[in-house]
């Protein structure tokens, strides 16, 4: 059996089960209730972050994978803060604040898209986006936090999550 992809219908960030979706899963040989339950479990891992799309990749009737796609990082931050655009003057205007833990969490969720070899470099990439958009981290400007990351101030926190990054 070749790999098949079924797009999961979403409504308000939750699975919207409809007859077409159920029929598509049944044709492949999957139990729609089991798939919906697994998709909901995966959505819980994403938590409060907005979801762009969810797909079920089916290799065989007994083997399938749930893939959750988040919006690009800039859009994710805007949605998180309820804004339409980033700061017009990012040096002086702040559109929102993240904790360093949230920054690490977003880096882990966006791992496949960031293409960074280490969690530290992924966090630095996110900090650059925060700087350009006017987002502070722990109430401080992103460039200050970036200097601290380079200086090793956050190594303890980053190392705690490095194993998750390597998986």
Swiss-Prot record:
> GO molecular function, one example?
large ribosomal subunit rRNA binding
* Record-linked InterPro entries: Ribosomal_uL11, Ribosomal_uL11_C, Ribosomal_uL11_C_sf
| SMART domains referenced in this protein's UniProt entry, alphabetically | RL11 (SM00649)
The cross-references to CDD domains, in alphabetical order and at most eight, read: Ribosomal_L11
Can you supply a Gene Ontology BP term from the record?
Answer: translation
Q: Is Transmembrane helix among this UniProt entry's keywords? A: no
Keyword set, alphabetical order: Ribonucleoprotein, Ribosomal protein, RNA-binding, rRNA-binding
**Classification via SUPFAM superfamilies:** Ribosomal protein L11, C-terminal domain
The reply to whether Phosphoprotein figures as a keyword in the UniProt entry is no
Query: What does the entry list under GO cellular component?
Result: large ribosomal subunit
The UniProt subunit note reads as follows: Part of the ribosomal stalk of the 50S ribosomal subunit. Interacts with L10 and the large rRNA to form the base of the stalk. L10 forms an elongated spine to which L12 dimers bind in a sequential fashion forming a multimeric L10(L12)X complex.
Q: Which family does it belong to?
A: Belongs to the universal ribosomal protein uL11 family.
Its annotated function is as follows: Forms part of the ribosomal stalk which helps the ribosome interact with GTP-bound translation factors.
What's this protein's name? Large ribosomal subunit protein uL11
To which species is this protein native?
Pyrobaculum aerophilum (strain ATCC 51768 / DSM 7523 / JCM 9630 / CIP 104966 / NBRC 100827 / IM2)
């Amino acid at each position: 059996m070749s790999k098949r992809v079924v797009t999961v219908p979403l409504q308000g960030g939750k699975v919207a089960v409809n007859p077409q979706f159920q029929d598509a899963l049944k044709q492949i040989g999957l139990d729609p209730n089991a798939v919906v339950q697994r998709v909901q479990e995966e959505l819980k891992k994403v938590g409060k972050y907005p979801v762009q799309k969810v797909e079920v990749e089916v290799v065989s009737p007994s083997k399938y994978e749930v893939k959750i796609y988040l919006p690009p990082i800039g859009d994710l931050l805007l949605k998180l803060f309820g804004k339409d655009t980033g700061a017009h003057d990012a040096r002086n205007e702040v559109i929102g604040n993240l904790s360093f833990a949230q920054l690490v969490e977003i880096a882990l969720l966006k791992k496949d898209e960031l293409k960074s070899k280490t969690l530290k470099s992924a966090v630095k990439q996110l900090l650059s986006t925060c700087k350009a958009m006017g987002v502070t981290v722990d109430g401080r400007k992103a460039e200050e936090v970036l200097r601290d990351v380079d200086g090793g101030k956050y190594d303890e926190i980053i190392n705690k999550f490095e194993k998750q990054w390597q998986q």
